[in-house]
């Protein structure tokens, strides 16, 4: 672009420097080449790594509460079960209300910005390539909570369908009722399934 006259040498050098920094950020985190073969016991934030995730493929209930993306509060809010320092930030960029913070370092664990108000649009849920984000409303209805999750199976369930909700480990947890199924081009072929479950 410089030799064609679109940008000058100073701007080119600045752009190349920014690209080098961004590329270096993508080579960081617990799965970075420099960490190959190393036993990582804590996240960059000092939180114990989920050993269940690494050995069984899911985060155990007693482990998930220690991560910053799992708040408890009234009203609809995101719950991010992202427990590893990996270079990823689509959820932060997708949220129109800036409810999700990752910060300057792309490998930081996502956290909910308590000063922002979630509108329940679901963009964060649809944008997460790891399918690790849910929208939860613990005060959906007297005695019931709602959970919105990514859904990529066919056929799509219908509002009013009933079934059994499963936990992270695949075990039966409780009865569930489908209260909505949303599909949109903005969700990039990921549907958002919202179920109603007992609050307990």
Task: Report the location of each language-model feature.
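Short beta-strand-centered aromatic/proline hotspots
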Residues: 171-185
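Iron-sulfur cluster-binding cysteine motifs and their immediate structural context
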Residues: 1-2, 89-107, 123-139
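N-terminal intrinsically disordered, low-complexity, charge/repeat-rich segments that act as generic
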Residues: 35-116
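Short, structured beta-strand/loop micro-motifs enriched in basic residues and often containing a Trp
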Residues: 140-149
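Short, charged beta-turn/beta-strand-edge "cap" motif at the junction between a beta-strand
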Residues: 132, 167-172
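Short, well-ordered loop/turn sites that connect or cap secondary structure elements
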Residues: 156-158
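Short, solvent-exposed secondary-structure boundary/capping segments
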Residues: 183-197
């Amino acid at each position: 672009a410089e030799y064609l006259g679109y940008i000058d040498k100073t701007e080119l050098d600045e752009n190349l420097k920014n690209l080098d920094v961004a590329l270096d950020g993508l080579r960081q985190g617990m799965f970075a080449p420099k960490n190959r073969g190393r036993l990582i016991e804590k996240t960059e934030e000092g939180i114990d790594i989920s050993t269940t995730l690494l050995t069984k493929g899911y985060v155990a209930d007693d482990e998930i509460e220690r991560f910053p993306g799992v708040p408890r509060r009234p009203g609809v809010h995101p719950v991010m079960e992202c427990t590893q320092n990996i270079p990823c930030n689509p959820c932060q960029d997708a949220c129109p209300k800036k409810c999700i913070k990752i910060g300057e370092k792309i490998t930081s664990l996502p956290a909910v910005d308590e000063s922002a108000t979630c509108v329940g649009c679901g963009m964060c849920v649809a944008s997460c390539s790891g399918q690790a984000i849910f929208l939860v409303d613990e005060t959906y209805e007297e005695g019931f909570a709602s959970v919105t999750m990514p859904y990529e199976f066919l056929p799509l369930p219908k509002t009013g369908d009933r079934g059994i909700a499963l936990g992270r480990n695949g075990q039966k947890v409780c009865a569930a009722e489908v209260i909505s199924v949303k599909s949109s081009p903005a969700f990039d072929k990921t549907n958002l399934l919202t179920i109603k479950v007992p609050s307990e």
